[in-house]
């Protein structure tokens, strides 16, 4: 079972693409290691860091930074964000 639910698409999330970062809504029970492994397996890019936070609505949001340049743009294009 994947810990990734869906990409989090806002204006701020689109600006983070320039910093090679993507945001996802994830399962509230998943930890940073599970999120990192799932994203690397799903998209084939190395993740540099994972930051998580819980929104005011009770959802868990993960901000992922990628090691390869332009990895976030490539993933966003694959999943139809761009």
From Swiss-Prot:
The GO terms describing molecular function are: rRNA binding; structural constituent of ribosome
User: Is Ribosomal protein set as a keyword in this record?
Assistant: yes
Task: Tell me one GO biological process term.
Answer: translation
InterPro entries listed in its UniProt record: Nucleotide-bd_a/b_plait_sf, Ribosomal_uL23, Ribosomal_uL23-like, Ribosomal_uL23/eL15/eS24_sf
- Keyword Ribonucleoprotein assigned to the entry: answer is yes
Q: Which GO terms describe its cellular component?
A: ribonucleoprotein complex; ribosome
Q: Which Pfam families match?
A: Ribosomal_L23
* Record key words, sorted: Ribonucleoprotein, Ribosomal protein, RNA-binding, rRNA-binding
What is the role of the protein in this entry?
Binds to 23S rRNA. One of the proteins that surrounds the polypeptide exit tunnel on the outside of the ribosome.
Q: Which PANTHER family match?
A: 60S RIBOSOMAL PROTEIN L23A
What is known about its subunit structure? Part of the 50S ribosomal subunit. Contacts protein L29.
Q: Which family does it belong to?
A: Belongs to the universal ribosomal protein uL23 family.
Q: What is this protein called?
A: Large ribosomal subunit protein uL23
This chain is encoded by the gene named: rpl23
């Amino acid at each position: 079972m994947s810990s990734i639910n869906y990409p989090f698409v806002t204006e701020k999330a689109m600006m983070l693409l320039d910093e090679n970062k993507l945001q996802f809504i994830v399962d509230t029970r998943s930890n940073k290691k599970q999120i990192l492994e799932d994203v690397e397996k799903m998209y084939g890019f190395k993740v540099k860091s994972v930051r998580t936070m819980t929104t005011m609505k009770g959802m868990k949001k993960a901000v992922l930074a990628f090691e390869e340049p332009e990895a976030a743009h490539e993933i966003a294009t694959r999943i139809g964000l761009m």
